[in-house]
Amino acid sequence: MKIFCIGQNKTGTTSLTKTLKKHGYKMGNQRKGELLFRDWKDGKFQSIVEFARTADAFQDRPFYMGDTYKYLDVNFPGAKFILSVRDSPDQWYDSLIRFHSRMFGAGNKPTARQLKRAGYCYTGWIYDVITSLYGTTEEDVYNKDKLIDYYITYNTNVIDYFKDRPDDLLLINLKEKDGYNRFCKFIGQAPKLESFPHLNKTK
């Protein structure tokens, strides 16, 4: 059974990865997935579909970007999707800013110049991802209204897409008391942990 974690970055995707591995799932290579950003931007979803044949479960980019989940759903009948969320859009935004500040801004919210110079998949990759995904500009790369609007709209669209297929989508906040048990029921396995591991937290 194929599983796609399609929640936004900073919604517990690292913890989900650890949990899925514990339950025997082979996770897709995250860096190889991130390198498919340009294909996603150009609408070349077939390369993403082909990459999704290389493992049992996937998370992070490009799987939480735009309508990618729709192409995956069509190409992988019977696949399950996990939409992880935070307590609120503001909490998600603040967590993302803290994480990027640590990764790319030397402790402060990164500037467009810093993002353009950041070396990750390629120099400027993170700038290209942010501006393409959220529709922001060089003048205000982390425009709060645009990022939060994307977060809300994306989650709403995913929920609406699967509204008549409750067995195919798990909407989950990893902080929920019964979240891990719901996860286990969703994937059809007995619990192997007491709860979700809390990893990659940004303070």
Stretch-by-stretch model annotation:
Residues 4-8, 60, 84, 146, ...:
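Conserved aromatic-histidine-acidic binding/catalytic patches
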Residues 31-40, 82-92, 114-115, 153-203:
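The conserved 3'-phosphoadenosine-5'-phosphosulfate
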Residues 46-85:
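Gly/lys/ser-thr-rich phosphate-binding loops in alpha/beta enzymes
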Residues 8, 16, 63-64, 105-108, ...:
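Catalytic cores of transferase enzymes with a strong primary signal for eukaryotic protein kinases
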Residues 1-55, 61-63, 203:
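PAPS-dependent sulfotransferase catalytic core
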